């Protein structure tokens, strides 16, 4: 009886922590950091899935989200995955309409994502060298390349 109870509890806990975004990302997303985010009735995960399919509206909404603390590192890594899939050229067109404040926030979010991403193509790189066009669009001139 204990064995069945344990299996039931493990299954329940696993189902609570699973999400449908991480399956499409190259890393496991700590979904609890994002579970309260809803934009126009869409969850963070729905926006991520839409963005990974190239949906411009989802990409723009995700690029505008401001998340604090550790969540910003993971959110930045998500944005890097999106840029990698949709290409930097398409991403630049989509985010070109951001306000100056949103552009500054996006810069720091992607900077944090470069610190967090497990993708060897981007991990530990600087935004100035890996995405110079994005840095130019975002207008962040006074930040050193590191």
Which sequence ranges carry the predicted segments?
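Extracytoplasmic electrostatic interaction patches
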Residues: 70-146
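Second-shell loop/turn segments in exported
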Residues: 33-35, 46, 63-68
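N-terminal low-complexity, Pro/Thr/Ser-rich intrinsically disordered segments
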Residues: 21-39
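Boundary/linker elements of alpha-helical solenoid repeat scaffolds
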Residues: 28, 38-47, 73-76
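Amphipathic alpha-helical scaffolding segments comprising HEAT/armadillo-like alpha-solenoid repeats
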Residues: 53-63, 88-95
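Sec-dependent N-terminal signal peptides
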Residues: 4-13
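Bacterial signal peptide processing site
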Residues: 17-18
